[in-house]
Curated annotation (Swiss-Prot):
Gene3D superfamilies: Periplasmic binding protein-like II. It comes from the Bacteria. It comes from Staphylococcus haemolyticus (strain JCSC1435). Keywords: Cell membrane, Lipoprotein, Membrane, Palmitate, Phosphate transport, Signal, Transport. GO terms for biological process: phosphate ion transport. This is Phosphate-binding protein PstS. The keyword Repeat does not apply.
Length: 316
């Protein structure tokens, strides 16, 4: 059985070696069939997307013992920084690439391809003993996270006059960017921030007046310790995050999850190209195994069709 191995830790997060053990120079060779495939593809980015990549790799490594996928989970922003710097073949992202990131890639003449590999719902949760917060509107969430609401009573006059303890990912995370865009209208988030999502979960669990937000699978893994909060959308409809509401988009904080891959790596690195093909042919099963939601089947079909142009056989 393959094991995930910690190969390096930075102030941004842990880098995890996925798949077969062994070296590699971020290049790949071989026919693309199982044991003939040799080399490595390197990635970095979202801790939300990381569990999906790990699940994919558990399957991949069984038939590709000499093809290594190495990836970290330092956050979407940190992942794009390495992607732009030329240090990685792919970047995991829990938000779309920003215009300024696109420009930096364009300035370096780095072309890339976007793949939507799954769907997620950013989940808001409070302490398990909180018996009064059952739902929140986006406006109420904004008041909590911009510091306007200091106590629960400031959010709802019928709630206790107790100081709120708000927790958030830090700005290196795509979940932070998504929340800032969808909830905060780009206002600054005023909360205790952490780069480790597990620490945020633990903080909400330990603080009776705690509130936090994170990817759906982090809630799913800890739902015996936390209480989810239903979200009221702009039309006044209240919905809880479930696989169904995330898939049909009725949950107000639904979002796609991405892999961004350099076109050069798709053309020149057999390991990278075959892993992306493997990911799309998996049709979101690994995403479901990781606690997320598969993209519509048409998404995978269309992306597989687009991927064919990078196949070396198609150049002959």
């Amino acid at each position: 059985m393959k094991k995930w191995q910690l190969v390096g830790t930075t102030v941004l997060g842990a880098s995890v070696l996925l798949g077969a053990c062994g070296g590699g120079d971020s290049s790949g060779s071989g026919s693309g069939d199982g044991k003939d495939l040799k080399g490595e593809a390197k990635g970095e980015g979202s801790s939300t997307v990381a569990p999906i990549v790990e699940k994919l790799n558990e399957k991949w490594a069984k038939d590709h013992p000499n093809a290594t996928i190495s990836s970290g989970q330092a956050g979407t922003g940190a992942g794009f920084e390495k992607f732009i710097a030329g240090e990685t073949d792919f970047s995991q992202a829990s938000r779309p690439i920003k215009d300024e990131e696109k420009q930096k890639l364009e300035d370096k003449d780095i072309k890339y391809k976007e793949f939507k590999i799954a769907q997620d719902g950013v989940t808001v949760a409070v302490n398990k003993d909180n018996d009064f917060v059952k739902e929140l509107s986006k406006d109420q969430l904004k008041k909590i996270y911009n510091g306007e609401a200091k106590t629960w009573k400031d959010v709802n006059s019928s709630w206790p006059d107790k100081k709120i303890k708000a927790f958030s990912p830090n700005s290196s995370h795509g979940t932070y960017d998504f929340f800032e865009e969808e909830v905060m209208d780009k206002e600054d988030i005023k909360a205790e921030k952490n780069g480790d999502t597990n620490v945020i979960v633990q903080s909400v669990e330990k603080n009776k007046e705690g509130i936090g937000y994170f990817g759906y699978n982090f809630y799913e893994q800890n739902k015996d310790k936390l209480k989810e909060v239903k979200i009221k959308d702009d039309k006044g409809k209240t919905t809880e995050p479930t696989k169904k509401t995330i898939k049909d988009g009725s949950y107000a904080l639904s979002r796609p999850l991405f892999l961004y891959v350099k076109e050069k790596s798709l053309k020149d690195n057999d390991v990278m190209r075959e892993f992306i093909k493997f990911t799309l042919e998996d049709k979101g099963k690994s995403a479901e195994d990781a606690g997320y939601v598969a993209s519509p089947e048409k998404t995978y079909k269309d992306e597989l069709k687009d991927l064919k142009k990078y196949d070396k056989k198609s150049d002959k």
